Amino acid sequence: MHKLEVVLQADCVGGVSEALRKAKIGPFGASDITIFDPAAAPQGSYRGAPYAIGRERVKLELVVPDHEVEPAVEAIRDGIDAFGEGYAELVVLAVQDSMDLRPSPWTRRRETR
């Protein structure tokens, strides 16, 4: 299994989610994040004092089986390219194990009194 983390512009989320849906890959989580890059940060000013402004981005996270990694990367690339001027950073991490933490009626233990 692999975990894919994609940081992209908010405008590209619709295209990427549509491309993942067409490739039948999912589900995924989405989070709003702010990136602060001191080397290339846009400058703002407050009462004449300059400060770095963060860039608003969206982070998508999904865990896929080994055989779906390449199709998922291609779907993400196609979703970004469909937008035209899209920009994204993709990180692929190997996952050794995962577990579902939601309680289910079949796995609950009965308490003895």
Predicted regions and their residues:
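Positively charged, small/polar-rich N-terminal and surface patches that mediate targeting and assembly
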Residues: 1-113
